[in-house]
Amino acid sequence: TADVLCNINLEQLIHVHEVNQRNMSVVYKKMPKEQMSSVNSVLNLDETDTVSCVKDYDASHYAEDDLIAMSTGIYIINTDFLISLMEVEQYEESPRKLRYLLLDKLVDVAALGYEYAGYMKNIHDVKSYYDANMDMLDPQKFTSLLHATQKVYTKVKNEEATYFANSSEIFNSQFASGSVIEGRVENSIISRRCQLEKEACISDSII
């Protein structure tokens, strides 16, 4: 399976779900082909944004410039309806995990598709994990993810600020607190409490 990185306003999603009076709503994102994976599910939606088909992603079915409606695996479900689904499923010979149960029910229950238009990264392998981190060096993507309407606050460590020696050379990089930097860093993300000596050179890396 894949994970998604995004900052979604759940209150807005719940409002749309309630206004449309559906038992289930699912968030999707139109993704470029190069960011898709065979583990992703693709949604087809009709003119009312109702999910009409769910299928596994197959790269051979899409052109390079296509935008593909990828399911994010984020759902809003009425509580009573969810309980009834799970009560029925528990008596099956091989009960499905919840994420598969919900995915399989999208068409049957005429689920509403909710398009997410903000920053999102589909993380399904080491490269996509690396790319998601490198995206944070882009100010627009960084702001969209961490400083949207609902801001993200990381855990406070109350450490001293990172120290940059006179010998340090820094280009397009981000640093957490508590580090000592004496060498050269470019296009990289450096975590807390890292020590880079004078002769060290870090490039295009996550440390």
Spans of features found by a protein language model:
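Unchanged
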Residues: 1-133
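Left-handed beta-helix
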Residues: 80, 89-207
